[in-house]
């Protein structure tokens, strides 16, 4: 029997990274088809043959006007909807058509975002060791993770994790998972992709399901990708954008029916009650205290905010609950205005917007000149993801990080 002289503790030490996980690059993508919110009520009621529902259309018009959204992007063009009329009826069986569409398009949009992130990262794809792919729709085998790995030409040894049907909180989830992977696997480079196409949920209006109309006033399509890794290789010009300091998830008791989605023959149905913003805003103070108490941070206006903009009421009530200055939510409100709610991808768009606004405004760090920041994801459960971030200096030596 041969006795090894290597101790398990030493093996474990060699397996782990030395430093904290960081976001090294961010990329985003949207479908080409852009819809403006001012035009959408007329368009939506026309393509769904619902113009006779004048009172309902007026209500939808008011929803769109109060959404704080200027425009959104969607894979569904009028031509596609004309070819799939069952998708325009509230209760018509249409799952096969929706599934075929989403299974094909989600990886394509994810690939586009991933290519942008990889371009900014500036390293060969052979260095990607892990792939985390997240989408709300299009469950299939092999999954979207496999398809995008194949499209990108990632190494066949890449370690994949596929996350389906998590919903809007999952933009935080993927960062939490990527942090664990990067810090526990020396040299790991994790490609994270969130790709969301809401074709599963599009349908005509119903006078008895007004919360479905709320979703139609908010949701858009988009994909975001990030590269996460520890111990940036400065010799290869790897540069962090944000360090991922800590990550936690919590379920809000008694809220399991607050945001509900069900996959049916008619597609994905969802329930969005009016008290969701109140549930979320009531939870934020406790989440902040738990996350920042160990760091000695107590002033919530002294940190930068990267918040999933599920809708204007969520941002408004969170802002009011913790007495935030209006400027703290600017990145989230900008993304809501220009893209709508893109489920899991949205908060990564906000992270991208944060570093760009910080550079455009001449701040010293990627977090509006502040050191500490928080990223929040909210979604079904109700589930709250809380990520503590640390910004990095913006310097002339790192021009690529702001492109």
From Swiss-Prot:
**Which Gene3D superfamilies does the UniProt entry name for this protein?**
3.40.47.10
One function term, GO molecular function aspect: naringenin-chalcone synthase activity
Q: Which of UniProt's keywords are assigned here?
A: Acyltransferase, Flavonoid biosynthesis, Transferase
Provide the binding site for substrate: 220-221
Its annotated pathway reads: Secondary metabolite biosynthesis; flavonoid biosynthesis
Q: Which Gene Ontology biological process is one annotated for this entry? A: polyketide biosynthetic process
Q: Which family does it belong to?
A: Belongs to the thiolase-like superfamily. Chalcone/stilbene synthases family.
Q: What is this protein called?
A: Chalcone synthase 2
Q: Which organism is it from?
A: Oryza sativa subsp. japonica (Rice)
